Amino acid sequence: LLGALALGDIGKHFPDTDEKSQGISSIKLLREVAYLVNKKGYEVVNIDSIVAAEKPKLKPYIDEMRKQVSEALGIEIENISIKATTEEKLGFTGREEGIKSYAVVLLKKI
């Protein structure tokens, strides 16, 4: 969302050197980013995302994740896609050293 509006990266807005950023909820960060998007005169239309992780298996959590994102952004849950995948034991995610995600968003000028 920040990149779509050339607002810099997450570290610009929530630096890891700032104590307020330590341990902060990702949903709280998303709400604050949504505020910046709206302040810039845009709204989120939809999100299509993929989370790559060997473990944990995310399928049991997808519906709740969609609900949380929907509430944080103030958009319908039907407009949020979260898909889980593995990388078949390849790379750092395949070695269970981390998780990564990708997202494509559609924004509309309001």
Where are the model-predicted features located?
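RNase III-family endoribonuclease catalytic core
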Residues: 1-64, 72-73
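Short glycine-rich loop/turn motifs that provide flexible caps or phosphate-binding loops at active sites
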Residues: 2, 7-10, 83, 90-93, ...
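A generic structural signal for well-ordered coil/turn residues at beta-strand boundaries
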Residues: 45-47, 86, 99-101
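Short, conserved loop-to-beta-strand elements that form functional interface hotspots
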Residues: 48-53, 63-93
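C-terminal edge-of-domain segments
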Residues: 93-110
